Amino acid sequence: VNHADIYPVLPRHRIDGLPESWLGVPPPPTGFSREGFHFREAIADRADIEMIHAWMNRPHTAKGWEYDWPLERWEAHIKAQLATAYSRPIVVERKGRPIAYMEFYRMAQDVVGHHYQAGPYDLSFHLAIADPADTGGGLGTTLLGTVIAEFFERDPRCDAIVLEPDAANGASRRMIEKNDAVHLGDVRVRHRHIALYAKVREGRDLPRLLPGHSTPV
């Protein structure tokens, strides 16, 4: 069964109106170790898919991501990411133990990237810490800072890392602000009211929201 024919895959992937050259941008950097963490691409095998599916169906991750999907949809979602340059599924390990799931993606090819002055190499990511016992102690803040630093180092053409937490998610916003990202404003994307943040490479200008895309706070 081709589960991609049954479930919508990469629902946020949007490339209409983008220059052809932007679609040739390589996928986000993966497969790196930094600050005691290893960030590897998820493998489209049973072990990784079942692990990620179990994590993302836990109450604390389902609330934030709304990705509490059946196993078959997760299989289709991971395979679809690995087949494009838009997004990559990531398993984060510490001392050999898997502790988090992330998705690295090119913001210009994402639905949110159509709400601000995105550049073709802009990067973003989402984070889900697997064990609720690991939340609230600074792990998320550390992981954000680690990935931001690595992105700028590994991708010299990336001038901005743009993050888009739910506007009402105070914990996520604090993690982002502790890493010196700047709030660009709020936008509404589908059913979500999000706060858009950016951290730019030293010497680069902050991107701006596109006219008419700002949502009152």
Where do the model's predicted regions map?
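Conserved acetyl-CoA-binding loop-helix of GNAT-fold acetyltransferases
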Residues: G136-F152, R174, K178
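A short, internal acetyl-CoA/4′-phosphopantetheine-binding micro-motif in the GNAT/acyltransferase core
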Residues: F125-G138
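Conserved N-terminal entry element of GNAT/NAT acetyltransferase domains
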Residues: V1-R46, D205-V217
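C-terminal "cap" of GNAT-fold acetyltransferases
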Residues: Y121, V189-V217
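Conserved beta-strand-loop-alpha-helix junction that forms the acyl-donor binding cleft
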Residues: I161-R173, R190
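Conserved catalytic-core motifs of GNAT/GCN5-like acyltransferases
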Residues: R106-A108, V182-L196
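Acetyl-CoA-dependent GNAT
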Residues: A83-D122, P132
